Amino acid sequence: MLLLLSPAKSLDYATPLPEGWPHSTPCFIAQSSALIALLRSRSPQQIAALMQLSAPLAALNAERYQAWQPRCSASNSRQALLAFDGDVYEGLQARTLSAPDLDWAQQHLAILSGLYGVLRPLDRIQPHRLEMGTRLATAAGGNLYQFWGRQIAEHLNHRLHDDPDPVLVNLASQEYFKAVDRKALNARVVECVFEDFKGGAYKIISFYAKRARGLMARHAITHRLSRPRQLEGFGLGGYAYAPAASDPERLVFRRKSPAA
């Protein structure tokens, strides 16, 4: 079973790194280098228009593209789990994971990325911004979905190759999960949905749902879950499995009010 997360727009390259964390190298550096070459040819104004960014943010990312190197080091990069700093990763709380937790996560967690395709938790990454939905034209087509094509699905197949019942647990957003070519994927997909009670009905509230995805990833990591059925025991953040609203491919978790 493999857990799938989205990356985060917010990055943290300032907080001191915890000691003793191992690291690995992303699998698609050649493809990342090709994308960086295209981005380097764009002016900050063009980047602002392409990604709908403010002028200061576009200028920052133009500088990042120029500084990016195919070789990651301790001075120019950090592990993906430490670099990403959004709501999902607030829920995951990677800094509090043990060494055995990290080793398990490295084998059972994948993070989708517009620039890197797909990452393992300990892959070193450099500061960047490139969302999967960006309409960056390449030789493969007009957007990143066409650029990555079958590559991400084939990578996930490889990681699930030895699993007798390959299952991909989707904790990613739809924008990112669209990058997984379902026709090329040799695995069953199970989606986790997190709903909060508001206005008289249960509904997905983005901020809470993102954090809950990170909580679910943490739960699976710390409990070494290997089958989708085990996910039903998730109870972090006040959520509980809702069997009447679920089916085998869509596990729904609900809560009445946010945990204090």
From Swiss-Prot:
InterPro entries: YaaA
Entry GO terms, CC: cytosol
Example of a GO biological process term: response to hydroperoxide
Superkingdom, natural source: Bacteria
UniProt family annotation: Belongs to the UPF0246 family.
HAMAP family, A to Z: UPF0246
Record-given protein name: UPF0246 protein Veis_4789
Species: Verminephrobacter eiseniae (strain EF01-2)
Species lineage: Bacteria, Pseudomonadati, Pseudomonadota, Betaproteobacteria, Burkholderiales
